[in-house]
């Protein structure tokens, strides 16, 4: 991957939120445990916004490019607008502790595509503690699903507690796993200090309407 000079630093620790310059794309991180539905959500956002905005996607996997390959296979964006970072270690390291590879990949996307409006940065699957460096993304979505039971929001963790949007995914499976969606919504509200939570099923709502509304609100606020 090409290397570039940056006017931002490559910290090994989180720093205050980056300041977006005029014309820079909004960067939204999408994180969450393995199998929670991150890639499917990214695909849904791309399908809904690709005709009205200039988009790109950056995925993170440990040893493969599987998530990027999935997005290309399903043609959610042109291939050149989807790229991957192979982290080679703990997934959270590349999105939080040493974000150099992700910053380089973002620079490559910006250089290849004029006037990008939005870059979605998907993390590799990790646990409830994984969050993005504020030097990498402007806002972040954290995706959990009902398969782990309705106790997951109650367990908290930085992703659940501090993400800008929490998504409780695969709600259509709740009856099959005995998860109480009202309990999940209540517990999420209790730990999130007013930050929004969305309960959704991409099976029932393939457009991810509530998440899409939130993404559009972030784009509008970014100007």
Curated annotation (Swiss-Prot):
Q: Where in the cell is it found?
A: Cytoplasm
Q: Which UniProt keywords apply?
A: Chaperone, Cytoplasm, GTP-binding, Nickel insertion, Nucleotide-binding
Instruction: Establish whether keyword Cytoplasm is in the entry.
Output: yes
Which molecular-function annotation in GO is an example for this chain? Answer: nickel cation binding
GO cellular component terms, semicolon-separated = cytoplasm
Matches recorded under Pfam families: cobW (PF02492)
The UniProt entry, under InterPro entries, shows:
CobW/HypB/UreG_nucleotide-bd, P-loop_NTPase, UreG
A single Gene Ontology biological process assigned to it is:
urea catabolic process
Give the signal peptide range. Answer: none
Q: So which domain of life are we looking at?
A: Bacteria
Protein residues bound to GTP: 32-39
Major localization class = cytoplasm
PANTHER family reported for this sequence: UREASE ACCESSORY PROTEIN G
* Family from the record: Belongs to the SIMIBI class G3E GTPase family. UreG subfamily.
Q: What is this protein called?
A: Urease accessory protein UreG
Task: Say which species the protein is native to.
Answer: Mycobacterium marinum (strain ATCC BAA-535 / M)
């Amino acid at each position: 991957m090409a290397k570039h000079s940056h006017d931002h630093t490559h910290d090994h620790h989180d720093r205050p939120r980056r300041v977006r310059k005029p014309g820079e794309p909004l960067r939204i991180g999408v994180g969450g445990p393995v199998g929670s539905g991150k890639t499917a959500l990214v695909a849904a956002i791309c399908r809904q916004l690709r005709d009205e905005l200039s988009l790109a996607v950056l995925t993170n996997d440990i040893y493969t490019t599987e998530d990027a390959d999935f997005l290309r296979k399903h043609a959610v964006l042109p291939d050149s607008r989807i790229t991957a970072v192979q982290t080679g270690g703990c997934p959270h390291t590349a999105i939080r502790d040493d974000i150099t590879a992700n910053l380089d990949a973002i620079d490559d996307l910006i250089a290849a595509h004029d006037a990008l409006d939005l870059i979605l940065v998907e993390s590799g699957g990790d646990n409830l503690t994984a969050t993005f460096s504020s030097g990498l993304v402007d806002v972040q979505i954290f995706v959990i699903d009902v398969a782990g039971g309705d106790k997951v929001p109650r367990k908290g963790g930085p992703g659940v507690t501090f993400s800008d949007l929490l998504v409780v995914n695969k709600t259509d499976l709740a009856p099959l796993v005995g998860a109480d969606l009202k309990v999940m919504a209540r517990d999420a509200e209790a730990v999130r200090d007013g930050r929004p939570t969305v309960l959704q099923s991409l099976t029932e709502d393939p457009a991810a309407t509530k998440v899409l509304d939130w993404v559009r609100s972030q784009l509008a606020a970014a100007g």
